[in-house]
A protein has these predicted regions:
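Active-site histidine-anchored catalytic micro-motif
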Residues: 2-137
Length: 137
């Protein structure tokens, strides 16, 4: 029986503001390689109330469609009780702050057009961190 290894890493980056997309795919793959884990899972978590993770294609037209969807679904202006950025919090509850991806033969497995993307929903530039945990053998 093989012991399960756990490798933890943090990646910190800056965002410029509302509905910005940051592709994290290469950083997750780099972390998997650093871990030495060949088979298992990579779990990525964004510990923020106004940031989400999505698996999507990074075509600019699709990213714009996602932006428009979020803006129409939860408009910036509304009868919100929370001051200043309620819409950012509400957009973040639509999608989870984490994703789990398979690791096979030392590689993160993405679909043909998939990338792991952080979506900034807050209105101000922010320093953001994601926690990347790789488990396996």
């Amino acid at each position: 029986m093989t012991d399960v290894k756990v490798f933890n890493a943090r990646y910190t980056f800056s965002t410029k503001g509302e509905i910005e997309f940051v592709d994290l795919s290469d950083k997750v793959q780099e972390t998997v390689l650093q871990s030495g884990i060949r088979n298992g899972i990579a779990h990525v978590f964004a510990p923020h109330a106004t940031g989400i993770l999505i698996l999507t294609e990074t075509d600019p037209s699709l990213l714009n469609d996602i932006r428009v969807f979020l803006e129409k679904t939860v408009p910036r202006q509304g009868a919100y009780e929370h001051p200043s950025n309620a819409h950012a919090h509400l957009r973040s509850v639509l999608l989870p702050p984490d994703k789990t991806l398979p690791v096979i033969d030392g590689q993160v497995e993405f679909g043909t057009w998939q990338s792991l993307v952080f979506v900034e929903t807050d209105v101000h530039p922010r320093k953001r961190t994601v926690i990347i945990q790789v488990l396996g053998e």
